C-alpha cells in the first residue's frame, strides 16, 4: 500500500490536496490524523467528510450483532468457484463503553447502520457510534424503551453536508412521530400519525441514500374481533419508507413477488450502499428467491424496479429460514450469505447459497439469540 506523506503535498494547492485526500479510504485516513494538525482539522470538517463519503472508494466490512455485542467478521469467498473452502470467522468485539452503566459494558439489542454510523439501542438509551473514528453520541430518551419502539437513522440531503437525524415511532393505531437532530442535540415531535400500515415486530429496517425502509403490511381493520387471534401475523405486502429530508413516510414500494402466507419468510438488506435486496422463501414449497432493485441514483425514490438475482429450491435440504434471518449479497461470486438462528443447534450458523444448488453450512460460534449480520462501510462522518 502506498504511504501518504505530508511533505509530498506541501507544494500542492490546498484544493488539490483536499480532492486527493477525499479519495483515500477512511481507514487509511484514520491513521493519518496524528501526522498533520491541518489534516486532522480537515478530517473533522463536515463539508469534507461529506465529500469524502461521496468520492472515496468504499470499503465493505461485515459486522454481526450477537450476545448483545457488535463484533467484526472475516468473510473470504474468493476461491468459492475453484473448490476452495470459504473462510468465515467472528473476530473480536468492537469496544463501546457505556458511561451510564456501572459495569461499563454496553449491551446492544438493536443496530441500524447509515453512512458508517451505527445507531445502537442499549439498556440505558440510544447511542450513535462511529466505530472507525471511535466517536459516540449518547442520547437521552424521555421515556423508557418500549419493545415496540422503532428507531431509524438517516439524513436530510443538503448540498454542503448531511443533516443526521433519528426518527422514533411506536407502531400502534396512532403515535407521536419524533425526530432527534444530531446537530442541535434535541428531540421534537412532528405530530400524531395514524398510519394505514403496520411493521412487524421483528422487521429490521435498512438505510439507503439517507432514507429508511421497512417491510410492512396493510392494516387489517376489516378483521372481525374473533378472527384477530388467527390473524395475529399479517401478510407482508410492500415496503414503506421514511424520507428524512421531508420528514414524512413515503409512498409504498411494491414487492416483486406475492406473499400467500404469513409464514412466508421475508427479509430486507442493502447491497453496497446502492440497492435494496429482498430475501423471500415460500413456506410451502421452500423455494427461495433473492431480488434486487435496479441502481437507484436519486434520493427520492417514488418508484423502484426489481430484478431477480437468485432462485433456489431448498426443498432438497428441507430448510426453512425464519423472518429473523439476515443476509448479504455477493454479486461477484453470485451467492448470498445468510445468518440464522437454529433452534436445535448449539452454534450460530452461516449459510452460503448460490447458483447450481450451491449450499454450504458453517457453524461459527456458540449460539446466541437472533444474531444479525450486516454490511458496514467505514467513514469519517462526524457526530
Curated annotation (Swiss-Prot):
Gene3D superfamilies for this protein: 1.20.1280.50
Coiled-coil ranges per UniProt: none
Kelch repeat extents: 110-158, 160-211, 349-383
Keyword check for Repeat: yes
Protein name: Putative F-box/kelch-repeat protein At1g62270
InterPro entries: F-box-assoc_dom_typ1, F-box-assoc_interact_dom, F-box-like_dom_sf, F-box_dom, SCF_F-box_component
Keyword Kinase tagged: no
The entry's keywords: Kelch repeat, Repeat
Domain F-box: 6-51
Species of the source: Arabidopsis thaliana (Mouse-ear cress)
